[in-house]
Design a protein with these regions (language model features):
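N-terminal small-domain helix-loop-helix segment of the aminotransferase-like
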Residues: 1-7, 14, 65, 194-197, ...
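Active-site phosphate-binding strand-loop segment of PLP-dependent enzymes
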Residues: 54-124
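Phosphate-binding glycine-rich loop
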Residues: 1-25, 246
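PLP-dependent enzyme catalytic core of the Aspartate aminotransferase-like
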Residues: 67-68, 136, 255-264, 270-311
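Conserved PLP-anchoring active-site segment centered on the Schiff-base-forming lysine
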Residues: 18-40
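Conserved glycine-rich beta-strand-loop-beta hairpin in the small C-terminal domain of fold type I
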Residues: 185, 192, 208-217, 229-242
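Conserved core segment of the aminotransferase class I/II
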Residues: 133-210, 219-222, 300-301, 307
Length: 311
């Protein structure tokens, strides 16, 4: 039931083209990976943002709003991010089943981007959307890849899974039409090698990334308490709540880059709910993370001094 392709984003764009028609709505849950917007808008479809509710500690789904948006006859596709990027949520079985039931009720197909599925916190369970129940299996297309986990993005390799024979055929046709259905021979062999022989390395990586996250959390608590890291159980990314400092993550990210040379992503690009947040990648050596946190500290200090002067 797997269809090989050159990347998750090309597959998402193909799904939007094949499973919807122009001017229809595609629902996403923001803040979410910014390329989702491109895959939707570049193909002449409308973005519907189901903003996740944030209580200062964690994110949850606004179920009432979600049902209203799915009930709109113009909404025909939902792109689910599982695990969620940038917040790091791993949606539990009950949540996924509820999403599946609502989408089935309102005839909405689910495309589940599960590219971060192998990058979970050690000891934490990840649940594929299609595995939850028959409903989730029959109404969904799942996108997976080794590219985040094993740093193989440059090889352009991914796969699409669809148990439903009709969805499987439609995706196969569109991926071939778009000429993104055949990864190169080297990518195929690298993918096989990664999954066959990379388990021990991956376990060590997950432990290492988790320690980096713990370091960042402790550093912020001690040195920059105005920034609050959102607790996430997946991805090698950290989602930082900077709203006690600024409401514009975009401007803050630019300032940090200018003053310290540290590259972080402003939260505004991830849609509603991303304002005042930063996304930080900690999939690197401890020394680089330590240096990055020191640069962040210096930039925050400079920002606060400028704010004080301007007032």
């Amino acid at each position: 039931k797997l269809i090989f392709t050159t990347g998750v984003i090309p597959a998402l764009s193909s799904a939007v083209r094949k499973l919807t028609t122009p001017a229809e709505n595609v629902l996403i849950q923001t803040p979410v990976y910014n390329n989702f917007f491109n895959s939707i808008r570049n193909n002449g479809r409308n973005v519907v943002e189901n903003e996740l509710l944030y209580d200062g500690k964690e994110y949850r789904i606004d179920w009432e709003k979600l049902e209203q948006q799915l009930a709109d006859p113009q909404t025909t596709l939902m792109i689910l991010c599982n695990p969620q990027n940038p917040a790091g949520n791993i949606w539990d079985r009950e949540t996924l089943a509820r999403i599946g039931a609502l989408c089935k009720q309102y005839d909405v197909i689910v495309v589940s981007d599960e590219i971060h599925c192998d990058l979970t916190k050690p000891g934490t369970e990840y649940i594929p959307f299609a595995s939850v129940d028959d409903t989730c299996r029959d109404i969904s297309v799942t996108c997976i890849a080794p590219t985040k986990t094993f740093n193989l993005a440059g090889l352009q390799t991914a796969a699409v899974y669809a148990e439903n024979s009709i969805l499987h055929h439609r995706m196969w046709r569109q991926l071939n039409t778009d000429e993104v259905a055949e990864p190169n021979a080297f990518a195929i062999q690298a993918t096989i090698a990664a999954f066959q022989y990379g388990e021990e390395w991956l376990d060590e990586l997950r432990e290492y990334v988790e320690k980096n996250k713990q370091y960042v959390t402790e550093f912020l608590q001690e040195k920059i308490p105005l920034i609050h890291p959102v607790a996430g159980d997946a991805t090698y990314l950290m989602w930082l709540d900077c709203r006690k400092i600024t409401e514009s993550g975009r401007q803050f990210a630019k300032f940090i880059r200018k003053t310290s040379g540290l590259y972080v992503s402003g939260g505004n690009q991830y849609g509603k709910g991303g304002e005042g947040f930063l996304r930080v990648n900690v999939a690197t050596s401890k020394l680089v993370v330590e240096d990055g946190m020191q640069r962040l500290y210096e930039s925050v200090d400079a920002w606060l001094k400028e704010e004080k002067i301007s007032k």
